[in-house]
A protein has these predicted regions:
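Hydrophobic structural packing positions in well-ordered secondary structure
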Residues: 1-2, 68, 220
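Accessory alpha-helical/coil subdomains and C-terminal extensions
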Residues: 1-62, 77-78
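Glycine-/small-residue-rich active-site loops that bind phosphorylated ligands and cofactors
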Residues: 9, 73, 123
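A generic structural signal for beta-strand entry/edge sites
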Residues: 26, 61-65, 183-187
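Short beta-strand-to-loop capping motifs
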Residues: 31-33, 66-73
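Short, solvent-exposed polar/charged micro-motifs at secondary-structure junctions
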Residues: 37-41, 65-68, 127-129, 155
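Conserved beta-strand core positions
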Residues: 53, 64-66, 173
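Short alpha-helical segments enriched in small residues
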Residues: 76-235
Length: 235
């Protein structure tokens, strides 16, 4: 997996770019898991297909804010240009506004009034701290937190550890992060489980240690959000 260095941008300046043009349509998307180059390639293709299409991006550790403006030349109940944009990024879109992963996760847990426990090894507590930094009330839905070194060398070991943690905490859902730092990167492994199923995820990140941890954190949060959104999630 190739990971690109994030660009630096000022969110306030990006918002100002598209102001005071009432004849245009504006939208914002948050996407996860695509490289900066891939995102730009997709946006350039859209620019060739949609009238007056302009964009700005803010890319940071696998998460990208995309700000778009375009012109609908034909009035219609269905915004075909918006459909083209959404189709281009498909399952990578996790928000059509400024909501972060942490805010979405809090909203899903609070709406369902369900509990979560988080066991962090390789991410060193960054998942829990990010969740609580944005939503102090999330503490009401966290049953247990562990920040402790351990090693599961195989998927089977991680499944066993996950099921035990789920049983011990009595939570509706658990998240466990694991992995191993290697030369120039991180082999990241994590699990998400409810009472009916366990999902194991594996990723390889190439970057310095701190950046790898940030990407691992974002990856775990993204897949946790997807799991909580699933209609068949066993609540």
């Amino acid at each position: 997996m190739i990971v690109f260095v994030p660009i630096e941008a000022d969110l306030y300046i990006l918002n100002k770019v598209f102001e005071n043009q009432p004849d245009l349509t504006y939208c914002q998307y948050k996407v996860f898991g695509l490289s900066k180059n891939t995102i730009i390639e997709k946006l350039e293709l859209l620019k060739n297909d949609i009238p007056y299409f302009e964009y700005k991006i803010l890319y940071d550790n696998l998460i990208c804010d995309i700000f778009i403006s375009y012109k609908n030349e034909e009035l219609s109940l269905i915004d075909e240009n918006k459909m083209k944009i959404v189709s281009a990024f498909n399952n990578n879109i996790f928000s059509e506004n400024s909501f972060s992963l942490c805010k979405i996760i809090y909203s899903l847990l609070s709406q369902k009034n369900k509990s979560i426990s988080i066991y962090e090894n390789i991410t060193k507590g960054k998942i829990v701290s990010s969740l609580l930094d944005e939503n102090e009330n999330l503490i009401n839905y966290i049953k247990d937190v562990k920040i402790k070194s351990f090693q599961c060398d195989s998927d089977d070991e991680l499944v066993e550890t996950t099921l035990k943690y789920l049983k011990d905490t009595g939570s509706d859902v658990v998240l466990i992060t694991n992995g191993k730092f290697v030369e120039n990167g991180l082999n990241f492994k994590f699990s998400i489980a409810d009472k009916n199923e366990v999902h194991i995820f594996n990723s390889n990140f190439k970057a310095d240690k701190n950046k790898c941890i940030e990407m691992a954190k974002n990856s775990a949060l993204f897949h946790l959000m997807k799991k909580l959104r699933q209609n068949n999630f066993a609540f």
